[in-house]
Amino acid sequence: MRKIMPYIILILSLISIIALYYGYKYRNHYTPAIPSIKAVKLSDNVVEVKYEIEEFKKDKDMYCLKKLATEQIEEDDVWTKAQNNKCSFIIDDNIYNFYLKNNYNTIIKINEASYLGNITNLSVDKEKVYLAINGTHTPTLTISSVGYADKTVKWISNNDSIASVDSNGKIKGLKNGNTKVIAKVMDKEISIDVVVTNLITLRPKKFNNKKKYLSCNIYSKEDNDLLDEILKDRINTVGYKTRAGVVEAARFLALEFPYKIRYFSENGRMGERKYKVDGEGRYYHEGLYLHSSRYKNIKYVSQGPKTWGCTMYNRVAHKRSANGLDCSGFITWVLVNGGFDPGDIGAGVSPGIKDLTDYGEKTIFNAKVVSSGKVKVGDLLSSTGPGGGHIAIIVGEDDDYYYVAESLWTSPNVGVVILPYSKKNLFKRYYYVMLMDSYYKEDGKLTKLWY
């Protein structure tokens, strides 16, 4: 008996171990499955949660739910059945909480998933900016994100001796040159090309009538090209083929261009004339007329071609003077650069001849019209008397004044200027106002003032 006792004990031990094993297996087989989270990751806009469940669980079904972080779990929430031990959640820029539950209503909050987030895209309102020295621009940065993303922006200038940038993204031009300003958010970045140039000046609140007249041949082709780029950028920013685009062209030439354009009585024009002349007291083309490379645009000549600031014979004054713009030459230049095609025409009120006063709603100007609120920045003005003869454009307005851009021939305001006129007596100088809504169609990003 003693000899077989060890074998009996061994057999009983094995039976006990087997019984414990199957007892454990049986107990785990029928008790609720509790998942063990193995991996949580975010790819693009999908949060993926992987989990494991003990091998012997009979009921391994699990269900997934996302809820806004501000919301509580409700009885009528719709849970999605997990597949292959994985839950996938599509998210957006809201903050969510994520949950798993089994068939026994045991709910587990997946805390790691709630703190995932990334930046999906960065965009700016302008990818290239042009600044005068000491000029500033604050870009509008749009951040697209999903989940719990850190939207802290780090601004960097590649050359802070040319242009600096502060923590709020305000860019300041310091000296001539080109550089990039970069906005970094998490793992994404976007760059803005910055051109700083002394070819333009800061726009003063009041027109500087003391600035020098443009001289002949002071600009290179590259200068002219860059100024044309800046002009186009200014117009596109507020809206090409809009009221604002036309106003911006006038503001640029009078305020941002550093020289005053002289008045030059036209030697002729291309519209409504048998004897056609192009670019002599006018320039019915996009861009500025500063370099001889622009001669290729000129279709007809009388005494030219000569760029603005260069002298040639004036057939009206019977003397040589610097080329520039007469009143209708200025207004047609403004219109064509703003995106419109009125034709290279004049300013009078002439039956049977197309004039600038034929555009828009020609209205006799008086105090009633002023008080009606119908007059807007961008409307044209005609003087003197019912026969016309002079044309101008309103480029600014405040409570008391209209600010009028025009090319004048009388001292002390000879050339392209902006002058303030009281709303109480402006109509004493201008007989007609052309209300231009029907012509422009759209206002664009119109502002009453330029500052």
Residue ranges, per PLM feature:
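N-terminal capping segments
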Residues: 203-328, 332-338
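Surface-exposed, short loops/turns at beta-strand junctions within beta-sandwich domains
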Residues: 88-95, 172-177
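Low-complexity, Gly/Ser/Thr/Pro-rich intrinsically disordered linker/tail segments
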Residues: 419-451
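Beta-strand-rich modules
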Residues: 95-106
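N-terminal Sec-pathway targeting helices
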Residues: 1-13
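Extracytoplasmic soluble-region selector
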Residues: 116-202
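...with weaker cross-activation on analogous glycine-rich loops/strands in unrelated enzymes
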Residues: 340-414
